[in-house]
Each structure stands twice: as structure tokens, then as C-alpha cells.
Amino acid sequence: MKQPNLKEIVRLQFNRQAQKFSSWSVTKNQEYADYYFNFCEMAPGDTLLDVSCGSGDFCIFCAQNIGHATGVDLSDKMIDLAKQQAMESGIANTTFRRGDAVSLPYEAETFSIVISKSAFHHYSDYHTIFSEMKRCCYRQGRISIQDIVAYDDKEVNDFFESFEQLVDTSHKVACSKSFILDLYQQHNVDILSTMEITIDLNLNDYLNHAVRSDKDTVHLEQFLETGLKDDVIKNYFQYKEKDFFFKRNVFVILGQKKSR
């Protein structure tokens, strides 16, 4: 039997977990949305393309303060949720459609800002996708990526890569910060600003935002138990206000497409 490729794994996984992902506290976090909106320097006249928009929450947030927000995602269920949420919110200046990030269904130079938020760790065709983001962006428009990034310590990073793949089978790999910086430079996009922040993620909340088999759940619990006995790994976990959290670095970058 032919094994599904990464793209099909991502599509099927997000179709299965669309409602869970949409309801996740991180997806709904208005403080995170406001921070990223301001980081991207969005303004009333902007037209936004959100590549791999998920359930459309950030598009809907932005649409209240810009000209128009467009979201595209590989998952049918995610797009259905995005349309439903926009309608229920009474936000008319949004458009959502199913599409593939490696071949975006838009004309060249259609949007003033093109972003990919919390999605690059599901990709493998980084250069193709970034080229498509750049193609769809105005000349002198902005291009932004926001995503989790690799840990500096190899032992720690190896642990969390295995952890992420057990949590969600659609996880490919968290890119390094240097890889993302190189991506901008190799595609001749000027870097305007960058920021790396460490956030504390609620472990139980994080585990519940994705779906997995009972077998994988047991494996994940055993894997975490082993990791928490490691003198290095355990430092990335902590109890806070009766909940268990783990540390994850997030990198945000904003660039500008050249005028020619």
C-alpha cells in the first residue's frame, strides 16, 4: 500500500483535529494576535494573505483593522471553520479558500503583506513556498514568518522533535532561526525586524490541541516520563499555578520585497 506523503498527512491530520485546533487557547489568544499584528506593522490600507491560515482566527482579527484579509489552507475542514467563524463574527472583508502553499492560487503582486503563522514546521518545500509567498506580495510589500524554532542544544532539540511528532503526526521539523534568516537572504528579501521570544506552553492544553491514536498516546506518556528523569530535559518543564508547562522558543521575522 502506498504511504501518504507529508502533504497528505498534514491535510488528513488537520481535517481530523480542526475543531480541537480551532478551540486551542493559543489559537484564540488575543494577546498573541495583537503582538503579531503590530510586529507586522499592519495598517488600515493593507491587504493580507495568510498562508496556512488554519481556522482563520488571525485573519478575522486582522480584518477588523485592515482593508481585506485572505486565508488559504490545505485542510478543507479548517477552511470550513474559518468561513463559519467569519460569518458568525459579522466580518465581511475576509476571503477563505482551500489551496496548496507550494502553488498559491493568486495572481502575482496581489497582497501588501503575506504571512505564514505557526506553519513552517509542517512544511518540507521551504524554498518553493517562500517563493510563492514572495510572488504574491506587492513590490516593497512585507513578508513575515512566525513559528516555533529549534532549540540550540542538540540533545534538547532531539527530545522535543520526537515529542512534537508524537503529539501531532503532521509535525515535520522546527527550523533553526539561522535557516529562516538564510531563507530571506537567499530569496533577496530585505529583513526589517526579527524577534525571538520564549513562551511557556501549558502541557495538558498542548497535548489536547491535536488528535492521535491510543497507541501513540501511551507512547507519548512513556516518552515524557523518561524525559522528565533527564537532568537536562527536566529543566524545560515547570509547575506554575498548579499546571505543568514547557518552554518553547518562537521566532518572528518581517521582511520587505524589493522594488525590482
Language-model features, listed with the residues they occupy:
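Short alpha-helix
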Residues: V173-N188
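A short glycine-rich, Lys/Arg-flanked "PGG" loop and its adjoining helix->strand segment in the class I
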Residues: H127-R139
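Conserved class I S-adenosyl-L-methionine
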Residues: M1-A43, D57-F61, M78-L81, S89, S144-L166, ...
